[in-house]
Design a protein with these regions (language model features):
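Central cavity-lining transmembrane alpha-helices of secondary-active solute carriers
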Residues: 41-62, 261-276
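C-terminal ends and interior cores of transmembrane alpha-helices
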Residues: 76-95, 295-311
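Multi-pass alpha-helical transporter architecture, strongest
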Residues: 56, 85-90, 175-189, 361, ...
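Juxtamembrane intracellular "pre-TM" segments in multi-pass secondary transporters
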Residues: 1-2, 186-221, 246-251
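A membrane-interface helix-boundary motif in multi-pass transporters
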Residues: 158-174, 373-409
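C-terminal transmembrane helical hairpin of 12-TM major facilitator-type secondary transporters
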Residues: 288-335
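Cytoplasmic membrane-interface "Motif A"-like loop-to-helix N-cap segments
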Residues: 62-76, 280-294
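Helix-loop boundary and gating motifs at the non-cytosolic
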Residues: 1-51, 215-252, 258-262, 332
Length: 429
């Protein structure tokens, strides 16, 4: 049993190491090659492919290809296309165009996004075969995914790859290792006798009937609105921190030179704040917990707008990273638990799919594109020569952009408090 737990720990570590190599630093690279105005598109594509690729790969895993093998195939393809994106960056340097870089990146992301769910399936199957309780055994294993994400961020930060195409090669390398490793994992048998389902049932669309319930409808709408916040800091926090490097007085500041490391505090906080959820849900209930999440997002954005790389401003940056854990966990995990407790067992999995679709699909996509429009309005690209090389930064009125994001989260939180009707009963938590 210890052996299978360790093997699943390695798998989860690698899955999220692939993601951590670029998710929080890609914006820096794009900004450095004068492509800052397209950051939103690179992050929106994650939401777009999340709308259909996990469901499609889930069908393939159920009927034709064992989940562990499909996991390996997806990571091999994702790594190959990410390496091609890195090659384009290496070959053309700062002259690389959107058309040369984006297609390879988009295809890579399309094959990567389903692997999170596939990894969960492999884990659940292996733990069940070993006679272990998945509810108790899986969370400690999943924590190592976050550790992999953080370690990958640190590697990219301290090697200096955060500023260049090399981060894409790091992601590809992790992916290739996992592609090989996945084929050694315990077999997940396919169900060749699976019944033919309708299109509606196959894609879990029957769960959309939940929108007929007024309270669930309000919940899902606000899930979409809060989901708009999710990719904002992933896409723009580190380019914002790096923008201070344009100004001589901040060029050597720790927050500028180690922007990705500073950002990783967010992931550490996310890991620790998971431990607070049971207490807060029991004590306050889902409504107050989600209101806290909206408030935390507002503070997250406000602290970024008010901060600076030195002195008390650096303290505000650190506070922004710490409060991210509350903002993310109190919404994503608590919201998922609410859906689980308030839907019929026959559509519970599909309902979770709707929740993820509203947040990481529609919400993240619309949020990325809207955030890009705001950032483009208040900032502009500018370059300077550093060590004989032209480096681009996105500079301008960043604080106003962050304050707009903070105001959005605050207003949506107030509307949620008014419109979401819920009576907390502690004994049900």
């Amino acid at each position: 049993m210890k052996s299978i737990k360790f093997r699943l720990i390695v798998m989860n570590f690698l899955i999220f190491a692939v993601w951590g190599a670029y998710l929080c630093s890609l914006g820096i690279y794009l900004g450095s090659i004068g492509m800052g105005a397209n950051i939103g598109k690179f992050f929106a594509i994650q939401g777009i492919v999340s709308l259909f690729m996990p469901a499609l790969m889930g069908i393939v895993a159920d009927r034709w290809i064992p989940a562990q093998k499909l996991l390996g195939i997806c990571h091999f393809l994702a790594a190959a296309f990410m390496a091609l994106a890195g090659y384009m960056g290496m070959r053309y340097g700062s002259a690389v165009t959107f058309g040369q870089l984006f297609p390879y990146y988009a295809i890579s992301v399309a094959f990567f996004m389903p692997t999170i769910a596939l990894g969960n399936s492999v884990s659940y199957n292996a733990l069940t075969q070993a006679g272990l309780d998945t509810v108790k055994a899986f969370p400690p294993i999943r924590v190592f995914g976050t550790i992999g994400f953080i370690l990958s961020m640190w590697i990219v930060n301290f090697t200096g790859f955060k500023n260049g195409y090399q981060q894409l090669f790091v992601s590809a390398a992790w992916g290739l290792i996992l592609a090989v490793y996945a084929f050694t994992l315990p077999n997940c048998p396919v169900n060749k006798n699976v019944e033919n389902k309708s299109f509606v049932d196959t894609f879990g669309l029957r769960a959309f009937s939940l929108f007929k319930d007024a309270r669930m409808c309000v919940f899902f709408i606000f899930s979409f609105l809060l989901g708009m916040c999710l990719q904002v800091t992933n896409g723009f926090a580190t380019p914002f921190l790096e923008s201070f490097g344009y100004y001589e007085e901040f060029t050597n500041a720790f927050a500028v030179k180690n922007s990705v490391f500073l950002s990783s505090i967010s992931q550490v906080s996310e890991t620790l704040c998971i431990l607070l959820i049971p207490f807060f849900l029991k004590k306050f209930g889902i409504k107050k917990v989600m209101i806290i999440a909206f408030g935390a997002w507002a503070l997250r954005f406000f602290f970024l707008g008010a901060g600076s790389p030195t002195g008390f401003g650096l303290v505000l940056f650190i506070l922004s990273m710490i409060v991210y854990g509350v903002a993310f966990d109190f919404f994503n995990i608590s919201g998922s638990l609410y859906v689980d407790q308030n839907t019929d067992v026959s559509i519970r999995s599909s309902a979770q799919g709707v929740f993820m679709m509203m947040t990481n699909g529609f919400g993240a996509t619309v949020g990325s594109l809207c955030a890009q429009a705001v950032v483009n309005h208040y900032t502009y690209p500018a370059s300077k020569i550093i060590d004989g090389k032209e480096v681009w930064f996105t500079i301008g009125n960043w604080p106003t952009a962050w304050y707009i994001f903070a105001a959005f989260a605050l207003i949506v939180g107030i509307l949620f408090a008014i419109m979401f009707k819920y009576k907390h009963t502690p004994e049900k938590q």
